[in-house]
């Protein structure tokens, strides 16, 4: 049941007392997290801290053993399937791009825009003017307008990452979960991506899982996880000065 605090404050994501064990190992241990509308939040933590399991729980891939997970204050995500949660407005991008490389950049966005329609319908029926206008908007946001007619497989790694973010944006999500988007990027691509994520936050909430240096580029609130719980939260300078974070994350 939602707490008084969460009812009084509008939230996009509310997690309270969430726990998940696998064969006796607590991957998530009494996790509490609140994401507000339009917030850009960075999730930080070493391997095994619980970041992936947390995102799996939010998207319905994994069910928690206990705790509350609510979307928009009122939707109990633990009662819905992955597909239902995606259709509600929660999008997830994994670390490795999953664009269809044999289709053009435009066609990838068209397929994403189709949403509930079948791929066959998307490929063989004309896109309405409203759909084309939405795709043009997404091209403006992700900066790939001049690449729309080339095959997605010909894009650079950073461009593929931006295309996949665009594919999520085409579906107009309220909450985006993004897994290590800058992995394998050049410094220039990383800077461009940080600006993109800052731009798209505001109209929607964005949760980015990444390392501390990329979080600095985002200028976002950071939440540090350790052993499935929140270890520290605040600005990057604040969490980096936290003695427990220094001990656990930086290994000093």
Regions found by a protein language model. Name each.
Residues 2-252:
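Glycine-rich phosphate-binding loops of nucleotide-dependent enzymes
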